[in-house]
UniProtKB/Swiss-Prot annotation:
Composition bias type Basic and acidic residues, residue spans: 61-96
Protein name: Circumsporozoite protein
Function: Essential sporozoite protein. In the mosquito vector, required for sporozoite development in the oocyst, migration through the vector hemolymph and entry into the vector salivary glands. In the vertebrate host, required for sporozoite migration through the host dermis and infection of host hepatocytes. Binds to highly sulfated heparan sulfate proteoglycans (HSPGs) on the surface of host hepatocytes.
Name of the encoding gene: CSP
Comment, domains: The N-terminus is involved in the initial binding to heparan sulfate proteoglycans (HSPGs) on the surface of host hepatocytes. The N-terminus masks the TSP type-1 (TSR) domain which maintains the sporozoites in a migratory state, enabling them to complete their journey to the salivary gland in the mosquito vector and then to the host liver. The unmasking of the TSP type-1 (TSR) domain when the sporozoite interacts with the host hepatocyte also protects sporozoites from host antibodies. The TSP type-1 (TSR) domain is required for sporozoite development and invasion. CSP has two conformational states, an adhesive conformation in which the TSP type-1 (TSR) domain is exposed and a nonadhesive conformation in which the TSR is masked by the N-terminus. TSR-exposed conformation occurs during sporozoite development in the oocyst in the mosquito vector and during host hepatocyte invasion. TSR-masked conformation occurs during sporozoite migration through the hemolymph to salivary glands in the mosquito vector and in the host dermis.
UniProt-annotated glycosylation sites, renumbered to this chain: 292
Length: 351
């Protein structure tokens, strides 16, 4: 029995030794957690289903069939409830007002303030402007009435209707958010107020520039259309942010490279101690690493110091390079498992 226990323990150590030997940097605690059995991840969903089935079948005796009448009554009640529920017809909540059609050959009348433009009938025409009058587009929600004799019809303001100006009258400027009236015959068109819309210029008139947030309509007959002011291109904020991010990343990468370079530079004290130990054996070839596991250094002579005496070697005569060996934990696991296996085999064979 004692020999059997020793063989079992030695076999466990042997199995633990194999992956550690082939994969040098295996963590022993992680391997134990993988090989161990975890009782915390038990799936309890099936247990709940079994408990529900057991509680459902607990009410009837052995060999007793479930009552079918109760189930049928419940189904009938559900069907009746479904039939009694009235079906609501799908109604369109957005009801649009009806548009009256004009008579045959009739003209299209103008709607009131904020009204909608009715559809013209067969052969109906849109009311034309007066003599030499031009008909511009109506504003948002506004209707365009006909212009007077010799007057030009401007664009209507937001939600309002645009009246026609008198012959030869001067056009005043509209207030903030107000409506812009039409200019008289050969009258000059003033600039629209803040938020106002720019009306069309009169016959022979010049088209002024639109005010703040104003829209530029088409010029009237013989009117000159000024070129809009050149827009200044705004650089995309994403591009600026991207440039800043690239600059920050470049700076961070530069600093990281400097840190890595500084970390890889061997310590001068470590180099001097290692040189003091192997001074007589330093040649133009790289020496072994100063450590068996972890981070160390190795040195060699430069070309001009090949024939120099070992006692006269200085740091200027040597090339130093950092070296990295296997982790000490992996080597310790290999050694400890090997020693434990050997001891157990000796005890099992000689007892």
């Amino acid at each position: 029995m004692k020999n059997f226990i020793l063989l079992a323990v030695s076999s466990i150590l042997l199995v633990d030794l194999l992956p550690t030997h082939f994969e040098h940097n295996v963590d022993l605690s992680r391997a134990i957690n993988v090989n161990g059995v975890s009782f915390n991840n038990v799936d309890t969903s099936s247990l709940g289903a079994a408990q529900v089935r057991q509680s459902a079948s607990r009410g009837r005796g052995l060999g007793e069939k479930p009552k079918e009448g109760a189930d049928k009554e419940k189904k009938k009640e559900k069907e009746k409830e479904k039939e009694e529920e009235p079906k609501k017809p799908n109604e369109n909540k957005l009801k649009q007002p009806e548009q009256p059609a004009a008579g045959a050959g009739g003209e299209q009348p103008a709607a009131g303030a904020g009204g909608e433009q009715p559809a013209a009938g067969a052969g109906g025409e849109q009311p034309a402007a007066g003599a030499r009058g031009e008909q511009p587009a109506a504003g948002a929600g506004g209707e365009q009435p006909a212009a007077g004799a010799g007057g030009e019809q401007p664009a209507a303001g937001a939600g309002g209707e645009q009246p026609a100006a008198g012959a030869g009258g001067e056009q005043p400027a509209a207030g903030a958010g107000g409506e812009q009236p039409a200019a008289g015959a050969r009258g000059e068109q003033p600039a629209a107020g803040a938020g106002g819309e720019q009306p069309a210029a009169g016959a022979g008139g010049e088209q002024p520039a639109a005010g703040a947030r104003g829209e530029q309509p088409a010029a009237g007959a013989g009117g000159e259309q000024p070129a809009p002011a050149p827009r200044r291109e705004q650089p995309a904020p994403g591009a600026v942010a991207g440039d800043g991010a690239r600059g920050g990343n470049a700076g961070a990468g530069k600093g990281q490279g400097q840190n890595n370079q500084g970390a890889n530079v061997p310590n001068e004290k470590v180099v001097n101690d290692y040189l003091h130990k192997i001074r007589s054996s330093v040649t133009t070839e790289w020496t072994p690493c100063s450590v068996t596991c972890g981070n160390g250094v190795r040195i060699r002579r430069k070309g001009h110091a090949g024939n120099k005496k070992a006692e006269d070697l200085t740091m200027d005569d040597l090339e130093v390079e950092a070296c990295v060996m296997d982790k000490c934990a992996g080597i310790f696991n290999v050694v400890s498992n090997s020693l434990g296996l050997v001891i157990l085999l000796v005890l099992a064979l000689f007892n």
